[in-house]
Amino acid sequence: DRDKLERSLNVALRKRPVQAEQIEQLVSRITRQLESLGETEIPSSTVGDFIMKALKSVDEVAYVRYASVYKDFRHTGDFARFLGDEGLDEN
């Protein structure tokens, strides 16, 4: 669902320096990638992986925000491990 995809990206990118046009481009790119799989039903985990990859290339803060929900972080240690695993703990 394109609208749900756009809402997810908007939540992650809220108050970040990313223009509405960039978000629309992300939605289009992810939608094309998902359609290219040729499947009628796509697991939410696959959609989440595509969103994570797109966000990482655009805004690391939005990437971590999305990951915190998608990967169900419960404690600060979850954030720390994720940041370390992704090599994002140095800045």
Where are these regions (language model features)?
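Long, C-terminal-biased catalytic regions of enzyme "large/alpha" subunits
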Residues: 1-91
